């Protein structure tokens, strides 16, 4: 790896939200510019408007193409050339279009290898459209532009928890039908590979959550654990993936068991997001796994209710910047090691100690817990 600073593309998000406030506050600290070269894909006029309206201490240089970005400063790339009306705190079609145009330009520039990592400010999917089609979120858009048919995985990343979900946003009544052995194996395998490559953990342990509140034979509320989830865990073990479970979510998080694992695979969206938000208190990051581009985002909304008030907390956005830098370094080192492997001097001996350690404890039939 060379000593050149990481080139970080940053999309401005919904122009009526808190995107520019987060960006300018994050890079107000000079040491942030020592870590990377930020290239903000946005509108120079909108950026200047927010800087003046909130008296933000931000200096930026306007550029027309990413190749012109220089180290030691905020580079504002004019991805949105037309006039954009700013109406702080109000989601409009115009503000949504500006968000998508910045992201689209960033996708084009990544194909041309003009930056290393991508950090996105929040977008509102309800007012973002692409030539008449609804915007389904950053992950879906990146899959469409760069995935070449592959599907990504959204991982919520905090200080003590990484969690992903087998299914995406669905009505709860449809979740069970969408959970299959194949899907669990696919998501868990990608999760494990991502933790190894992008988070520098050589042999990650994955906890798999149960779908139903109770999952032992006597008190189970459903058959999905026995018929789908446990067979999937067994198949993962055969592939060399350290997957354990299934664990009922209430006890798993209530007892702090998540701290024993490198990743947690939930069955549905809210089973992942509810404990994550409670544990991370607004400082969490969304990581898009399985795509060529390293993309992170603060796990927050566009913040219309506080837009323009200069009260937005940039902690999660700064964490997204840090995570993008860390994962780029880890991925680069991992890929370099894979391209130039050292000869193996010994072979690892596997045993069942880990499997025993993380096994679900059997409850006695007459115990109070078994009767609940």
Regions found by a protein language model. Give the residues of each.
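Contiguous, glycine/small-aliphatic-enriched amphipathic segments in soluble metabolic enzymes
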Residues: 1-138, 185-267, 271-278, 282-284, ...
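Short acidic/polar capping segments at secondary-structure boundaries
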Residues: 123-126, 160-161, 169-172
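Active-site glycine-rich loop that binds ribose-phosphate moieties when present
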Residues: 140-144, 148-150, 172-196
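Short, flexible loop segments at boundaries between secondary-structure elements
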Residues: 145-161, 289-305
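Intrinsically disordered or low-complexity boundary/linker segments at protein termini
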Residues: 171-176, 302-306
């Amino acid at each position: 790896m060379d000593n050149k600073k990481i080139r970080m593309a940053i999309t401005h998000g919904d122009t009526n939200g808190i995107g520019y406030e987060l960006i300018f506050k994050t890079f107000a600290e000079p040491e942030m510019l020592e870590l990377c070269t930020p290239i903000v894909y946005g509108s120079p006029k909108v950026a200047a408007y927010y800087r003046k309206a909130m008296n933000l201490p931000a200096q930026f240089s306007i550029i027309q193409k990413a190749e012109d970005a220089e180290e030691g400063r905020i580079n504002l790339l004019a991805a949105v050339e037309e006039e954009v009306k700013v109406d702080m705190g109000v989601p409009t079609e115009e503000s949504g279009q500006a968000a998508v145009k910045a992201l689209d330009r960033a996708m084009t520039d990544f194909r041309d290898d003009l930056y290393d990592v991508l950090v996105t400010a929040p977008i509102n999917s309800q007012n973002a459209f692409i030539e008449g089609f609804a915007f389904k979120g950053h992950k879906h858009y990146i899959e469409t532009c760069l995935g070449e048919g592959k599907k990504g995985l959204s991982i919520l990343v905090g200080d003590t928890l990484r969690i992903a979900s087998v299914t995406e946003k669905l009505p709860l009544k449809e979740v069970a039908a969408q959970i299959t052995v194949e899907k669990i194996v696919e998501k868990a395998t990608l999760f494990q590979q991502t933790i190894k490559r992008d988070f520098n953990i050589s042999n990650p342990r994955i906890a798999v959550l149960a779908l139903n509140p109770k999952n032992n034979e006597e008190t189970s509320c459903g058959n999905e654990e026995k018929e789908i989830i446990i067979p999937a865990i067994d198949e993962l073990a055969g592939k060399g993936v350290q997957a354990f479970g299934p664990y009922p979510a209430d006890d798993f998080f209530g007892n702090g068991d998540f701290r024993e694992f490198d990743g947690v695979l939930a069955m549905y969206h809210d089973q992942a997001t509810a404990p994550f938000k409670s544990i991370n208190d607004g400082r969490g990051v969304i990581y898009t796994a399985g795509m060529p581009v390293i993309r992170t985002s603060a796990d927050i909304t566009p913040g219309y209710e506080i837009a323009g008030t200069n009260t937005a907390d940039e902690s999660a956005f700064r964490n997204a910047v840090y995570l993008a830098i860390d994962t780029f370094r880890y991925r680069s080192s991992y890929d370099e090691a894979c391209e130039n492997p050292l000869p193996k001097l010994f072979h690892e001996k596997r045993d069942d100690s880990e499997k025993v350690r993380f096994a679900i404890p059997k409850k006695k039939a007459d115990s109070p817990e078994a009767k609940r």
